[in-house]
Amino acid sequence: MIGIAEIKLTDNEIEAAIAVLKSGGLRQGPQCNAFEEEFAAHVGAKHGMTSSSGSSALHLPYMSMLEPGDEVLCPSFTFIATASMVSMAGGKPVFVDVDPDTFLIDLADAESKVTSRTKAIAPVHLFGNPCDRPAVEGFARKHDLKIVWDAAQAHGAGYDGKDVGSWDDVVCYSFYPSNNM
């Protein structure tokens, strides 16, 4: 059977994991705080906050910004969480075509999907390739939309010398083993 990922851990990593397990604090402890600070600094973000999964990382901003029935533009080629977290927050995902060469969100198609209920756009960086930041930000400004960037497959990716993790409004990562890191 072909596995999803081969786990290769150093002795130091194993010892660090054991120390956390022995501390009894599997969440919100000093290691978690240190990781949040170090990862935020690594990607150039002002703040970093961990969650239990990439899906929950996407759910949190939608809970804070959407009213029931608000729409979010989502690429049609993505992991299910991109749209399902919009629905879980009471919003309505509106699917947008993707560019056939990059599989990234097609802003020309997105233009035709904007309504008075559209509140956000959810561009997904795929395969380590970042979305066109100036184009997405210009689109969002034009339509007064928030941006929830899905960077689950873009650890270390950048655009014009800026890590995707430093972009506004919200950037969400996932550390699931099948994501490229």
Residue ranges of model-derived segments:
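PLP-dependent aminotransferase-like
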Residues: 64-151, 158
